[in-house]
Amino acid sequence: MPVYSRLPLTNSQIDYLVEPDIPSMHTLVSLPSGHKIRTHFLHPAPPSPTENEESSERDAELIIVAKSVAEADTPVIVTGDLNDVAWSETTRLFRKISGLLDPRIGRGMFNTFHTDYWFMRWPLDHLFHSDHFTLSKICRLAGFGSDHFALFTELVLETGNNVQQGGLKANEDDLAWAKDKVDDQNVSKYDVPQPETT
């Protein structure tokens, strides 16, 4: 899983949160201003007969990352090919637990998979951010040889008073469902690396 950055990455760690062969990357992105952004790059395996018969592993990975960022004071971005559509119960649960925002809401679907089939495309690639950011631009880029289109997202870090942005809130049923998913895979939010900003 390659991650390329024009900005310095520090305290980087590659980890295998749920499955021993599915990596994720956790790092701090250092801005020229000196601000640090806690960033998590994920690519859980999709539910499919050739990879995982169920979505349990993918769901657990998303939930433990959501729980790990929920109380973060620093700016946070979680991004990657999550192998899940934007409207799924699991993606909505991720948003509720993490408190992160989906910049696509109200702006379009931005279907990124599959580049070869215009009549069957799904928004599998995601970027979620904390309310430290506002959206400047979001668009799907042209194909570049992959079976996914790139999702270009330009965010602005608001260093003063943050604009109040609405996200989803988890209720007791959501939290119980998340606990069951995580317990089934024997993982927890403490398994997710939390790059320190100091």
What are these regions (language model features)?
Residues M1-T197:
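Soluble catalytic domains of enzymes that build or remodel membrane lipids, polysaccharides, and related
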